[in-house]
Design a protein with these regions (language model features):
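Core of compact, soluble alpha-helical bundle domains
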Residues: 2-153
Length: 153
């Protein structure tokens, strides 16, 4: 009797690890989504962010809806998917196309910095371990800089 595994055998999954189907089979390591606490983490992060956006004189007018709830929901879905959680964003809205979706709005360095300031409130409130905080903030900062489409004040 041999203890060799057959290539089609499914790996043993540790408790608390959620496998997602990937191009080459199920993922076998926890995703960032799992590491930070999943949906509840992203819901709180995004809610804290939108509390600031709701009163921001530069950012709030960029949202066509008076109620920021739908925008909050979309951002939660996007971040969950980006970080390895459910693919609900793409299922409901298609490819994220972040730059294209932001073209109608004047995103200048001031708007970028305001966006980052409100997001920093949520990130700070999350009290993440330094590694996860650094990974998250690096992405948010790069994404914010990439959305700039105007240098007009």
């Amino acid at each position: 009797v041999t203890s060799e595994r057959h290539p089609t055998d499914q790996p043993t999954v540790p408790a608390g690890v959620h496998l997602r189907e990937a191009e080459n089979g199920p993922a076998v390591v926890p995703t960032f989504f799992d590491e930070v606490g999943g949906t509840p983490f992203f819901e709180k992060l995004v809610h804290d962010f939108y509390v600031g956006v709701a009163t921001d004189p530069v950012l709030k007018p960029m949202y066509p809806e008076d109620d920021l709830g739908p925008a909050e929901h979309r951002l939660v879905m996007f971040l969950e998917q980006f970080w390895g959680g459910p693919g609900t964003y793409s299922e409901q809205r298609g490819h994220p196309r972040l730059r294209q979706r932001h073209v109608p709005f004047k995103v200048n360095p001031d708007a970028r910095d305001r966006w980052l300031g409100h997001m920093k409130v949520g990130v700070d409130a999350a009290n993440l371990p330094p590694l996860q905080r650094g990974i998250l903030w690096d992405y948010l900062e790069r994404a914010a800089f990439a959305m700039v489409n105007s240098f007009d004040e």
